[in-house]
Amino acid sequence: AQQLLADCAMALGGQPLRCVVNNASQFEPDTAATAQAQGLQAHWQTNTATPLLLGNGLLAWAQQHPSPAPGWFSVLHILDQKVHNLNPDYFSYTVSKLALERSVALQAQALAPWVRVCGISPGLMFLSGPQTQDNFDRASRVNLLQAPIDPAQVAASAVFVAETAALNGCTLPVDNGQHLVPLGRDVMFAIETTLHGAGAQEPPL
């Protein structure tokens, strides 16, 4: 982690490194009934362990580079609105993101007072897995605003959290209210049923 952070600092060309955004995710289909050890471990490594270790790396960095003000350094874990709105699809992915979401407050307590830790849980922004464009166009409106989520607003929210020192140990949904629209399946599968009926085949996985 320290070498990666040093490389990031060098890439910034002299600008101070103050925030790590953990956005990488593994997203493979399975259910609780079909999950295998290899898939569970792979999702855990990418979606949970690596973000937490990078946060610990920023702690060591912050302790070596005095900040101009309290709360200056921060770690942002990019989650998923699904952690607030569960369904049984993409089980290994969901479990790994739930673990990371539960870790936000714990890591914030452990890294204080040097580093703040927050989560951001966006909704559907891009084509997901085997999703078709028609399916996405409909699924992206399954939220309280009935409108697609603008990725630029998610990015702006990350900047806001990084610059607001009073925010710590919390998770901010940025999803047009998608987490308040419960579904029994992943939104892609729910829309597929709407388009083609209850007997429709799911998109190939």
Which positions does each model-derived feature cover?
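Amphipathic alpha-helical dimer-interface segment in Rossmann-like NAD(P)H-dependent oxidoreductases
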Residues: 9-13, 46-70, 108-109, 113, ...
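Rossmann-fold scaffold of SDR-type NAD(P)-dependent oxidoreductases
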Residues: 15-25, 47, 77, 118-122
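Conserved mid-core segment of classical short-chain dehydrogenase/reductases
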Residues: 19, 25-43, 64-71, 89-92, ...
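Catalytic Tyr-X3-Lys loop
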Residues: 26, 33-53, 76, 93, ...
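Catalytic loop of short-chain dehydrogenase/reductase
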Residues: 49, 63-112, 124, 178
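Catalytic Tyr-x(3-8)-Lys segment
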Residues: 135-153
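C-terminal substrate-recognition "lid" of short-chain dehydrogenase/reductases
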Residues: 148, 152-174, 179-180, 185-186
